[in-house]
């Protein structure tokens, strides 16, 4: 097995298979969930809007892969700084049955100099999760500056984030290797317990392999597991499957 095929299989097992589109329906979400398990492997999670969590869990059970986690999003996509709304949305997500919540950090507030509201929001949402996994989307492509990316990462981890995540996938610049390196370096400095999720823009096995290699270099091969590392993507799945089959991945405009 080639190194790239091996990386593709590994990346597939670390995917949060995602649909977060305004035109999502029960049928579209169910179709996505039926792709979670294939002869090429099983993804780590699916990520859908809160109202689709029940249909996602039902479809995954029926597809014979109840172990696939169901993630959802809150304070999404704009990362507003109203803590009470973010907490209410997070509680509602858990009530829907979500296993994991991806909350957007109030990144614009941080850019304006407010370093407190992000900590407060993440801490409150972690408490609202009631033991479920909390991933914090720092929107690295909007923060742009490495110092701000570092600061948002540090605040999120101190406030209790289980993962820090690059992007919503709804802005012009999503996951990049430089942002990932900054975030992973902070995770290492903070003890390596927090996980990392690259979201948006990772579309090929070659690109996925670069993120896997970066994480392994900074935190070790054993760290790179679904407990600590995820890809948030949609079009990536088909391209990984093409790579595993020995074909050539085609360009895609998906998440």
Curated annotation (Swiss-Prot):
Q: Which SUPFAM superfamilies match?
A: Aldolase
Q: Name where it's found.
A: Cytoplasm
Q: Give the positions the UniProt entry annotates as the active site.
A: 102 (proton donor/acceptor), 165 (schiff-base intermediate with acetaldehyde), 197 (proton donor/acceptor)
Catalysed reactions, as listed in the record: 2-deoxy-D-ribose 5-phosphate = D-glyceraldehyde 3-phosphate + acetaldehyde
Cross-referenced InterPro entries: Aldolase_TIM, DeoC, DeoC/FbaB/LacD_aldolase, DeoC_typeII
Disulfide cross-links: none
Main localization is cytoplasm
> Which Pfam families does its entry note?
DeoC
| Alphabetized UniProt keyword annotations | Cytoplasm, Lyase, Schiff base
User: What family is it from?
Assistant: Belongs to the DeoC/FbaB aldolase family. DeoC type 2 subfamily.
Q: What does this protein do?
A: Catalyzes a reversible aldol reaction between acetaldehyde and D-glyceraldehyde 3-phosphate to generate 2-deoxy-D-ribose 5-phosphate.
Q: What is this protein called?
A: Deoxyribose-phosphate aldolase
Q: From what organism does this protein derive?
A: Chromobacterium violaceum (strain ATCC 12472 / DSM 30191 / JCM 1249 / CCUG 213 / NBRC 12614 / NCIMB 9131 / NCTC 9757 / MK)
